[in-house]
Amino acid sequence: MLLGWGCNVFRPPTSPLPSVSRYVRSNPAALDNNGQMFKLIVREELDMASADRPTLFINATILDGSEHMEPQPDMAVTVERGVITWMGPSAVAQAPAGAEVIDLAGAYLMPGLINMHVHLCGSGKPVSAGDAGALMKKLDNPVGRAIVRHILKGSAQQQLASGVTTVRGAGDPLFADLAVRDAIDAGKYQGPRLVAPGTGVTVPGGHGAGLFAQVANSPAEAAEQVRDLYARGADVIKLFVTGGVFDATEVGEPGVLRMPVEVAAAACKAAHEVGLPVMAHVESTEGVNAALQAGVDTIEHGAPLTPEIMELYRGAAGTQLEGRAPSVTCTISPALPFVLLDPEKTHSTDTQKKNGDIVCSGIIESARAALEAGVKVGLGTDSSCPFVTQYDMWREVAYFAKYVGVGNAFALHTATQVNAELLGLGGETGTIECGKAADILVTRENPLDDLCALRDPTHVMCRGDLVRKLKVKRIPGVDAELDAIMAMPAEALAEELTRDGVA
């Protein structure tokens, strides 16, 4: 699911609890009768590091997030009450009273990464989700919802520990992302800034139905679901306009249009009336056209573009949220393994493999064409898909440079300032400058030389809170396969697509 790849639901990388799917399947009565047969106590510990104490970083090499991002050596950055209040040469820096002084010894200080497409409900292990819809029904009770919140909390903290300071959710079960966002914002525990949709909106038989999307049977139902999400506190609306690789029954038809234009248009109209942007899962040219006509603000994933679609991207439809032009979110991470790894490893059929090739090619082609036409392109991982962990945003940045063909500076600029602007957060985060939130990532090596430097940050700060324990619980088997892909030359992708008759 998600990108059509299937979804590893509930395999949290950090949770001390057993996998929810494993727990429920081995204890089928555990969550019956509102969880009364088995009482599972979930403790959401308070692990917030205070932002009250000022911090002074000295001897930093600043990469500010701007497009050309010239390194600024021997610099200092002062953080007070969660905000960058001063920047200048380390030689003249003065620590505020009581400040913690951190000598970076020349390390590279940059804005925290922003991940534009995240499902927090899984770990990225390539396992079957099984009957996820039935599992959701068992979890829809007070104890089950507490378990889901605990898992999403762990995933959010994995994102943060890996250097991601802002996450835009793409739909998770049981509105749990809204609760996690509120807990983070209230200071109950550390986590990234979370732009949360609650659940998505789909149609009968559509992507995400019964898992992380509500089913709308008509335009009126879609509009009502959007209004309900707004009342619950959603920051963005997620639509599932097309199917994906695993929905297709024949080679050549991934991304079949599922949501009628009138349903998508009703959802967009209701969202825009209350100021909410709309993001949409789309994996076909037909779907992109329908979504943009309906008023969708960001196309997630993408597909090959026609001249008519390029005009819609430029805002010719006039139905997007006021003040915003439509954009595309590039998500290479879930597509690439299905092209470059053996089907035995991805658990895909021959039909799914070939349709995966089509979608992967379309995502890359869409990003290239959009950039050439001046359309904004953001970056996200589609975390929770097979082989897409909660700690690998750095890989998406590297894939963007490698396969779309942009420079390292532009890739990092996209993952910071551009993503912030696309979220409407450009005045708050995305660059290192006075007055903005202290969302900071530090690496030993220069990512402008090698984006793999982003893999192991030495310091992460979000809204002025320094993460004291950068613990990323890695999945060695997944990492090994992805490292092998990273080592392949860019030409390997084109060669594989050509072999399958796609390129």
Task: Name each model feature, range by range.
Residues 119, 172, 199-201, 242, ...:
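Active-site beta-loop-alpha junctions enriched in small/polar residues
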